[in-house]
Amino acid sequence: PSKWMYIDHGQGAVETEPIAIRFGLPLEKTYSYDPKSPKIPENLRHHVLGAQCNMWTEYAVTPEYTEYLLYPRMLALAELDWTPKEKKDYNSFTRRLDNQLIRLDMHHINYHIPMPEGPMADRIAYTENTTLTFHNSRNYPMVYTTDGSDPQTSSTKYENPLHINKDVTVKIATMLPSGKLSPVRSIEVVREKLMPATEKSTQPGIELRRTEGNLYFVKDLDGAHWSAPKVVKDFEFKPDIEDKGAYCYTGYFEVPADGIY
């Protein structure tokens, strides 16, 4: 079932993970799968010999990224296959997993480490002050810097939300018990002034343009050929042609009070 066992799906939030077909399938979700589903009649469950995970590689284009998606969820698959449901214990599994990760290091396997999540973007704009709050999916400690350098094991440990009132770049990483760090997440925090309001005579609707092609990154839009604009009544996402491309909407919205929208 894809909700548990399609491990080509990203293991964390979309804003922290490399490109994948879907996101939000953490280790705990895979571990929680029960091969002997209650939907199977009890007198037939003994026919279930195990489970499998699916690993599609449309987006996993290198061996290193394939390993990143496979591990450690493949270890969760192994345990859920041989462990009776009543003896499954995710907390016990993750404690033992920390030792297994060291073994994976010895074999140079590029496994996933939970990334610092929380902020929905890697550039945060504010007017007076702002607060950044972080967490990760396995409650590992995190370390961070605000001087532009990459965090090390000796860097400041994240313990409370970060209150910010000046321009700064926050770099933060998750730290395993072994001292190994996750990839660094870098967030630019910028104090900005509000844009002046635009007074313009408007009509109902939004201007829509479309471009075709396989577009995975914003930079892929450079040099794109856009269709002639048309006015639509709302944000419609039903494509006129095969759904490979991007939409660009242009319009105005009413701002009732000063703020960041």
Model-identified regions with their sequence ranges:
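Substrate-binding groove of N-acetylhexosamine-processing glycoside hydrolases
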Residues: P1-M142, Y249
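Polar low-complexity intrinsically disordered regions enriched in Ser/Thr and small residues
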Residues: A13-E15, L27, P151, S182, ...
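Extended extracellular/luminal ectodomain segments enriched in beta-structured repeat modules
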Residues: K244-A246, E254-Y261
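Short, compositionally stereotyped local motifs that mark structural "simplifiers"
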Residues: P84, K88, T94-R210, L215-G251
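Bulky hydrophobic/aromatic packing residues
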Residues: R45, P161-L162, G259
